[in-house]
């Protein structure tokens, strides 16, 4: 599983280094160094703006997700299903890190996520996300506002 946060940079050509522990998880837990980069679910900042980042799925996980979306396992209305396909499936790009662990983030996805020099890689279990550092600071603040206040529910999760 992907866990932890790593602060890294992206160069002028759009290349960034995937944290070594994430590369290791790709190979040891998912059996493949290939992965898919796509748009992450936007975070509503409650002020009319949204935080946009990227989600990275091991290839096998992505293929399973793609099957579920195509089969409409969420039973979404057609308009929502088509929006989901355009927002998640459409921009998805299969990638592989080079021998130095670097990956080229496709230009359209860099623009979408407003990626500047500093990036956060954030482990999310069976995927990881990539955020511009400024956006990630706002995402964290929003997450704190959204954090469940029900102590019994948190205790049941072991938190």
From Swiss-Prot:
**Per its UniProt record, what HAMAP family does this chain match?**
MraZ (MF_01008)
Give the source species. Answer: Trichlorobacter lovleyi (strain ATCC BAA-1151 / DSM 17278 / SZ)
| GO CC aspect terms | cytoplasm; nucleoid
What is the official name of this protein in its record?
A: Transcriptional regulator MraZ
Q: What's the source species' lineage?
A: Bacteria, Pseudomonadati, Thermodesulfobacteriota, Desulfuromonadia, Geobacterales
Q: Which residues form the SpoVT-AbrB domain?
A: 5-61, 92-135
Q: Its Gene Ontology biological processes? A: negative regulation of DNA-templated transcription initiation
Q: Quaternary structure per UniProt?
A: Forms oligomers.
Q: Coding gene?
A: mraZ
Chief localization: cytoplasm
UniProt family annotation: Belongs to the MraZ family.
